[in-house]
Amino acid sequence: MQSLQVKILDERMRDQLPSYGTPGSAGLDLRACIDEAIEIVPGQTVLVPTGLAIYVEDPRYAAFILPRSGLGHKHGIVLGNLVGLIDSDYQGQLMVSTWNRGSNPFKLEPMERLAQLVVMPIQQVELKVVEEFTESSRGAGGFGSTGRT
């Protein structure tokens, strides 16, 4: 298993390190490192600290902060930036942009699992300017061009 460097910025997190919920989980659960409950009203976005910093280091990898499906489906709590991209050379605190897109206020409790962190391989590319593309079967068709079934 690949290792990931983590720095504990808030001592309360020492016993609350991100973990996988099940053996098959892809994401490590991130918690809200807050002193007291926060009420997030509909339409509001709040930046929530995790009390942790990571250093991926290897430029062949990046980390992604993703929403937890249950919070989004049941309560309308998603990420304000939809996906948080953590570059391999970033070393600051992980923050979760938390948006209540639902219709009811949501009470976020201290140390509540809020988002998940997924580490994935990344391929950097070199851009090659061309005048025309080699023709493909799809061409420039997009936004529903392949149908629904």
UniProtKB/Swiss-Prot annotation:
Organism name: Polynucleobacter asymbioticus (strain DSM 18221 / CIP 109841 / QLW-P1DMWA-1) (Polynucleobacter necessarius subsp. asymbioticus)
Pathway field: Pyrimidine metabolism; dUMP biosynthesis; dUMP from dCTP (dUTP route): step 2/2
Gene: dut
Source organism, top-level taxon: Bacteria
Function: This enzyme is involved in nucleotide metabolism: it produces dUMP, the immediate precursor of thymidine nucleotides and it decreases the intracellular concentration of dUTP so that uracil cannot be incorporated into DNA.
GO molecular function: dUTP diphosphatase activity; magnesium ion binding
UniProt xrefs under SUPFAM superfamilies: dUTPase-like (SSF51283)
GO annotation (BP), single: dUTP catabolic process
Family listed: Belongs to the dUTPase family.
Cofactor: Mg(2+)
Protein name: Deoxyuridine 5'-triphosphate nucleotidohydrolase
Residues reported in the UniProt entry to bind substrate: R68, S69, G70, N81, L85, I86, D87, M95
Gene3D superfamilies (alphabetical): 2.70.40.10
HAMAP family (alphabetical): dUTPase_bact
Source taxonomy: Bacteria, Pseudomonadati, Pseudomonadota, Betaproteobacteria, Burkholderiales
